[in-house]
């Protein structure tokens, strides 16, 4: 049986860094589902798709997202840093509330996670994508801590951003993601919650690895 590790939580909770390290330490695959919502968000915004439209299916027909060795390809072209901007994050969050977008990406994600050892991170992994995951983690941290992390991350990448704007964007995205009707950001009843506000990345990774060894003892 495969060992599937679901890591969910709000923007800046440390999901991406932690999930990547856990996958690396265990030597298994890693899936960043937020990247997929960013890809679709950018695609739809470039096409001028109205988020309130009853159907977005036509816009998604010509979009082929592939995932190979931890990298995404859109219609054969590798995806780069363009999906990491704050705007791409906002588009992702806006279009992620649309049922057609969720159906489109959930189907691909379920397929990627099928019968394979994987760490998948996002907002609805433990509730929708892998509801029967062997290990479910829900990471939390205060909005200020999360905004500070995102701020330093963006500055390091050369973006000229203000802390206050990053904090506002984080709070806005939290609201979009928690209040939407379909697959909102929420903790699965059987998920283990970890508050990362005062923990180092290594401490969080160690806690998760310990849980994985308990639940998937025959593999690791
Ligand atoms: O994780 P990241 O911040 O890159 O995700 C960008 C956006 O994609 C989130 O704010 C959320 O709206 C959406 N998302 C989602 N479900 C997921 C992953 C991301 O709705 N599983």
Predicted segments — roles?
Residues 34, 76, 105, 119, ...:
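Residue-level signal for inorganic ion chemistry
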Residues 10:
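P-loop (Walker A) phosphate-binding loop of NTP-binding proteins
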Residues 7:
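Hydrophobic anchor at the beta1->P-loop junction of P-loop NTPases
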Residues 59, 69, 109-115, 123, ...:
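Small-molecule kinase domains that catalyze NTP-dependent phosphoryl transfer to phosphate-bearing small molecules
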Residues 24-86:
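N-terminal phosphate/diphosphate-binding loop that engages ATP/GTP or pyrophosphate donors
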Residues 18:
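Hydrophobic positions on the alpha1 helix immediately C-terminal to the Walker A/P-loop
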Residues 83-92, 96-157:
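ATP-dependent NMP and nucleoside kinases share a basic, alpha-helical "lid"
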Residues 15:
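Conserved lysine of the Walker
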